[in-house]
Amino acid sequence: MSEIDAKGGIPCPYPPKKIIQVPVVIGKGEKQYLVVKEDCISPPSPPVFRIVDVDKEVVVTDAKLVPSVKYDSSDKGGKPWCLSKVIINGYIDKNVIYKTIKDYTHEDVNGPLFQFTTRVPFSTFLEIETQEKIYDTDKVEILSAVVEGEKEELFDPNPVPKCAPDWAVTYNKILEKILIRICAKVVRIEELKVQPEW
């Protein structure tokens, strides 16, 4: 049996449509960025003999959407397209576990493990290409932010102690080269009418 319309007493074969809000993906983009930083291992921390392990995490602290610019390009099949930018700020939280030299003979060395933790700030931007204009009311979401590769170089060596092996060199500085990849998307909240079931 159909329900009765409360206002006019007329049978209502379908329930009224409802409006829902859904996030719609307008576009996606990604960026690779090389971060270079020089770290100094200063007293009371001992100098570095060898790096044992490195833990790292990319943290995005802020993402700002820049309004888009519209283009007409023949290489897009004559269709208009928009290019927007996202300004990104963040840091890389990095922990280095390293060996140092405390005692030595003319053939070998020994010493404890130490850890060195630092935060490497970065600022960059990525581009997002869309088929429609992006507005200030649209939102940007970070899909992923990861370290894709890294390299640590030891430099600023100390003199080798007398009677120690010639390879027992410790270093006061680390040059860090970190390649990060950030992926983001732009979403817009749109209203849709749906027909609920009985």
Annotate each PLM feature.
Residues M1-W198:
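Viral structural modules
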